Design a protein with these regions (language model features):
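A generic "binding-loop/recognition-motif" signal
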Residues: 11, 104-105, 149
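Short secondary-structure boundary segments
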Residues: 1-13, 84, 88, 121
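Conserved phosphate-binding loops in N-terminal lobes of ATP-dependent enzymes
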Residues: 3-61, 68
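Glycine/GP-enriched mid-protein hinge/lid loop-to-helix segment characteristic of carbohydrate kinases
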Residues: 16-19, 24, 28, 35-38, ...
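Short, small-residue-rich loop/turn micro-motifs
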Residues: 61-63, 146
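Glycine-rich phosphate-binding loop and adjoining helix at the ATP-binding site
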Residues: 32-43, 56-57, 64-122
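A generic structural signal for well-ordered alpha-helical segments enriched in polar/charged residues
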Residues: 44-48, 92, 179
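Short glycine/serine/threonine-rich phosphate/pyrophosphate-binding segments
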Residues: 13, 106-108, 133-135
Length: 182
C-alpha cells in the first residue's frame, strides 16, 4: 500500500511517502501561519509524492481527533486546524481517503505494537515537542476516553491554572529560561 504521510507539528510539518512498508522521499517545511498556506503546502507535497498507486493520505496532528465527525477538537499550537470538517476538506483536495490521528497517539500506538511496549498489555507514552502529549494503550489499542483526551497529559493543571505544557514543554522551558535571564 502506498500512502502520502504528514506529521503536522507546532514548528514544522514532516512528510514522506509510505511504500512497501518503508518511508522514503522524506522532507519537511515550517508550519504555516494560516490554513490556506497549510493547504497549499500539503497539496504541493502530495503532488510531488503521489502516483497512480497512492491509496490515501495519513496525517498525525496535535489535538483531539474525532474520526467519526472528521474534526480535530481541542487546542494546540496550530489553532487553525481545529473545529471544522478538516477530513472532508482534505479528501476533496486530494481526491483520496484521508485518515488523521493525534500525533502522540500515533507514536504511542507504534511503540505498543512494534517498539518497547510490544510485550506489554498496558503502556503509556509521553511525547515532548512544542507541547506535551501522550497516549495510553491497553491490549494494543488506543484508549481515548469518553472525551478523546485520554493521554493528553499536557493539559493537566499543575498550579494556578498553568498546564504541564505551559510549564514543562521544551518550548516553555526555553521561553521561561530566556525570560529569567533577561
Amino acid at each position: 500500500m502506498n500512502l502520502v504521510v504528514f506529521d503536522i507539528g507546532g514548528t514544522s510539518v514532516k512528510y514522506g511517502r509510505y511504500q512497501d512498508s518503508a518511508i522514503d522521499k522524506k522532507g519537511s517545511f515550517p508550519t504555516p501561519k494560516t490554513w490556506e498556506e497549510m493547504k497549499e503546502n500539503l497539496h504541493r507535497v502530495f503532488t510531488e509524492l503521489s502516483d497512480a498507486d497512492t491509496k490515501g493520505v495519513a496525517i498525525s496532528s496535535p489535538g483531539a481527533v474525532d474520526t467519526e465527525e472528521g474534526v480535530i477538537k481541542g487546542f494546540s499550537a496550530i489553532p487553525y486546524i481545529h473545529n471544522f470538517k478538516i477530513i472532508d476538506e482534505l479528501e476533496a483536495m486530494f481526491g483520496l481517503p484521508v485518515t488523521i490521528e493525534n500525533d502522540a497517539n500515533c507514536a504511542g500506538l507504534a511503540e505498543s505494537q512494534f517498539g518497547i511496549g510490544k510485550d506489554s498489555k498496558k503502556s503509556i507514552y509521553f511525547i515532548l515537542g512544542t507541547g506535551i502529549g501522550g497516549a495510553v494503550c491497553l491490549d494494543g489499542k488506543l484508549y481515548k476516553g469518553s472525551s478523546l483526551y485520554g493521554g493528553e497529559f499536557g493539559f493537566m493543571i499543575i498550579k494556578d491554572g498553568i498546564t504541564l505544557s505551559n510549564l514543562a514543554s521544551p518550548v516553555a522551558v526555553a521561553k521561561n529560561t530566556l525570560k529569567s535571564m533577561a
